[in-house]
Curated annotation (Swiss-Prot):
Chief location: secreted
Gene Ontology cellular-component annotations: extracellular region
Lineage of producing organism: Eukaryota, Metazoa, Ecdysozoa, Arthropoda, Hexapoda
Domain of life: Eukaryota
Reported function: Cecropins have lytic and antibacterial activity against several Gram-positive and Gram-negative bacteria.
Family that this chain belongs to: Belongs to the cecropin family.
Keywords carried by this UniProt record: Amidation, Antibiotic, Antimicrobial, Immunity, Innate immunity, Secreted
Pfam families assigned: Cecropin
Protein name: Cecropin-D
Localization annotation: Secreted
One Gene Ontology biological process: antibacterial humoral response
Keyword Secreted attributed: yes
Length: 36
């Protein structure tokens, strides 16, 4: 078991989540701005 390997894998998962969530967050922010 390698803590650094695990950390790296977790970091990649977080980065993937941010990348996939980015457009959704932008869309929500835009919708909120339009709704005001």
């Amino acid at each position: 078991w390698n803590p650094f390997k695990e950390l790296e894998r977790a970091g990649q998962r977080v980065r993937d989540a941010i990348i996939s969530a980015g457009p959704a967050v932008a869309t929500v922010a835009q919708a909120t701005a339009l709704a005001k």
